[in-house]
Amino acid sequence: MGTASKSYQYNLGTYHRKVTTANAEAQVWFDRGLIWSYAFHHEESARCFEKAIAEDPGCAMSYWGLAFALGPNYNKPWDLFDEKELKKTLETIEHALTEAKDHAPDSTELEQALVDAVQARVPKGLQEHDFKACNEAYAKAMESVYERFSDDLDVTALFADSVMNLSAWDLWDLKTGKPTPGSRSLEVKGFLEKALEQDNVYEHPGILHLYIHLMEMSSTPEVALVAADHLRNLVPDAGHLVHMPSHLDILVGDYRRAIASNADACLADEKYHNEHGGDNFYSFYRMHDYHSLIYAAMFAGQSKVALEAVSRMERSLPASLLSIESPPMADWLENFSSVRVHVLVRFGRWQELLSLPFPNDKDLYCVTIAMIHYGKGVAYAAMGDVEKALRERAALKEAVKRIPSSRICGDFPNKSNVVLKVGEAMLDGEIAYRQGDYDVAFRHLEEAIKRDDALTYAEPWPVRILSDLSHSRDIDH
């Protein structure tokens, strides 16, 4: 093994896929690129595939990997690329696709099939219908590959990914437990569960990762717990994969384990951050892992863990990162600056909420400012100062109007201005409750629940818990 490979500091486990290359270094870098792509760290994945290409410019699968890593994914479809980023990305992908096609004749039949399929993944235009058409074309192409090579675990994972991206975060109807109309959730469930019966499947990060994403929105998320337990320590330095089991831990109420997995994920993320910094899109996943640790601690009643995680998250989220325009980092990340408010509300730390300063940059920190108004409003209501709570409620309403529709909430893929409508109703309920208008208060909280239920699936907000607590307080009263 060459010097470059020996110096690579990330423990990615042992997963390996042999590709057509006589260069051992190229093979090592290819494996790393593939694992990182399964871990949704697409920038590091692309970097590894570029290293593989540098070692063996004739390896078609390295170009395939580069094109795949730079394309759309479950958390970032084509329409969430900004214009400048999209143009640059498509140029790189198109070059990689050409090179992959040129070198494919020297590859295996399966590799040639993958190279042919990924050609369909590039949109013919830059409109919404172009993105939809290329996603459908790619899924159809991968279906043909799967029909020929259905026992291959990588093919199964890539096919599952292509189909799930047609209905990303909308795979199941959360009210009925049935597949969302038009989705192919049961089909994906069938071939992923077929793959889960194969030998060595529990060493495959892609299958395990996608099965968790598939089942977390279903009415039976617990069926994926075995897969989650195998994924938990499979790729120790891929923070997102270490975090993924906590999606299920939270849903089944295993908050202690959710805290443990997310704590490990944050350490892995910090290891990467210490070497590469935070000026990359993976910072979104890094923030999500902190956020998940915080939420698990909130559900478990562990204020110390939650507040320590908030402080770590805030230290790694400077204004310089939020100011990056392409991709528009403020749209993806600024909402995480507001998470401290949720923690202080959850643990009833009213004086700390009232002492929270407002950021100076009202445009950059528009979500954070709105959330602070929400938190201060709850604090004033809880302390019996209804007049000041109403003042904060009015300020919250105006602050929400200033949030651009492009700002994503921490509960991806929901938008911040939509999610804060839940907060408005919750605050209305708190104020009415303190005014003694219990029926009105509960109607507001029911409205908050209704708005919360209308959101696209994401890690849960504790609206129902708040409503239940309020009813309990009324009974005690």
Q: Which role fits each region the language model picked out?
A:
Residues G2-G58, Y63-D151, L158-Q198, L208-S218, ...:
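Short coil/linker segments at helix-helix boundaries
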Residues Y202:
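Soluble catalytic regions of membrane-associated enzymes that act on cell-envelope
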Residues R256-H273:
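Flexible glycine/proline-rich, aromatic-decorated loop/lid segments
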